[in-house]
Regions:
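Soluble "head" domains of membrane/secretory-pathway proteins
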Residues: 2-12, 27, 31-37, 42-249
């Protein structure tokens, strides 16, 4: 019986360990959680550009969109679990399943949703809101202040929203009736979000089919100020927003 040379055996062990690590990472990404980062300000102030999160895939069960590249020859959801109003979800657009989108669930199947005079109404009742301190940010190098409110959804979920003082086209909408097996989603920055208020033909989200949900956003594991630069090492540590790491609501 011949033994493998020690160097050959060592390289084989390393390759095997790397392969097992890759398989484990793929398995976790496929079955448990999907990493996701925020590319736009539509969910401010809850989620900021530069936030990195994990979306729990088992929260709602599994669909073909739970798999990488939306592969899979089945429809609907396996081990389906209910979606709660107020959940922050990652989903795929029916017209373009390549990208990931993140919004908050506002309307459940059968709900009537409308925005009138800038106030959200669900099933004919205005949602309670209360003004709090303005949200401060930077835009084009200049400080910005945006009116911020706390909104309380039916069921008791409280979360912050932004709403610019001036009324826009998204502040007065028709009444939407959420179809069976679909959800109505909105961004927390109500004046800066192409969401279910906007038809798909106009670049919006429209209603989101249940099978297009990828997962629920539960945890933020990293947050980096987008103003940091590789060329300026002095900004590296300052760019890490440690206070934002943790649960997402």
């Amino acid at each position: 019986m011949t033994r493998k040379p020690r160097n050959e055996s060592s390289w084989f062990d390393i390759a095997k360990s790397v392969a097992l690590a890759l398989l484990l990472a793929i398995g976790i990404r496929t079955a448990l959680a999907k990493p996701f980062h925020v590319p736009s300000p539509s969910m401010e102030p809850t989620l900021l550009i530069g936030d990195y999160m994990l979306a729990s895939k088992f929260a709602y069960g599994y669909s073909r969109h739970s798999l990488p590249l939306s592969l899979g020859g089945f429809s609907g959801r396996l081990f389906e679990r209910p979606v709660a109003r107020g959940d922050i979800v990652v989903f795929k657009l029916p017209r373009d399943p390549r990208g990931d989108y993140v919004k908050r669930v506002i309307g459940l199947p059968g709900d009537r949703v409308q925005v009138a005079g800038g106030v959200l109404h669900i099933n004919g009742a205005a949602v309670a809101i209360g003004r709090i301190a303005d949200f401060q940010s930077i835009g084009d190098g200049q400080p910005l202040r945006t009116p911020r409110h706390v909104e309380t959804l039916p069921g008791g979920v409280r979360h912050e929203i932004l709403h610019a003082s001036q009324m826009g086209t998204l502040d007065d909408t028709p009444e939407f009736v959420v179809p069976p097996g679909h959800y109505f989603v909105m961004g927390d920055d109500r004046s800066n979000s192409l969401d279910s208020r906007v038809p798909a033909g106009m670049g919006g989200v429209d209603f989101v089919p249940a099978e297009n949900l990828v997962g629920r956003v539960d945890f933020r594991h990293l947050s980096v100020d987008p103003e940091w630069r590789w060329s300026a090492p002095s900004t590296w540590l300052k760019a890490l927003r440690f206070e934002r790491i943790g649960g997402v609501g």
